[in-house]
Amino acid sequence: MLLIKQNVDPYEFSLIGNVHTNRKDGPIHSIYGNPKYPLVKDKHMNDKLIGPGILGFNAGHVTVDSTDPVSLTEAMIKGRKLVRQLHEGLVEFEPKSFGASFLASTANLMGIRESRRIKCDYTFTLEDWLARKEFEDSIGRNCYYIDVHKQDATVYPRYKKGESHGIPFSCLTPAGLKNVMVAGRCISTDSYAHGSLRVMPPSLVTGEAVGVAAGQICKSKSPDIHNVDIQKLRKRLKEVGQLI
């Protein structure tokens, strides 16, 4: 859930620095499991000071089927109740910083990390990520960790400095379609690999690739995304600064 709190005490907050989950004495560790806050099902809390006395949060989770409008509506109602409990917990366990604070806003829409993905000519998998796999049709690099937010998710070691994998153009080209390409979080991956490739840097990489590819295709006499000249595409991407 995304929320903004205002009237946070600037001085007192400067003394604690943050309320991130990684802070061992942070308030979320007291809020989670407390019967007063039953909607808080995990310890996810990420905060960012965005203005004087204004703190933005990415905190908590709500399970939802994003293909079902009823489920989405229920999740948005439950999510705002969850936000209220997080606010009250922060007031209780960090009163010096948050005692006079108030909820200024919540996100207008439900944020969905994983929903529909499109089946392309190639599906990038967890095994590819673990192997730091290279591809002949690679159009960029990625080194982000496997960031899956379900509580029972397996945790995989992050890449070391300098390690990365290739992103194949073939996971951007939907099978059976000639005039549609995909970029960002809807590219063809399995669930765990999606946890790495859904974020902004690889989305920028795949977006740049399909943009350049589209420019090439539109000049063709018989446009077809599956007939892109990969070497020409890679050459142009290198020229504009993309790491291949």
Where is each model-derived feature located?
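Flavin (FAD/FMN)-binding glycine-rich loop and adjacent Rossmann-like elements that form
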Residues: 1-244
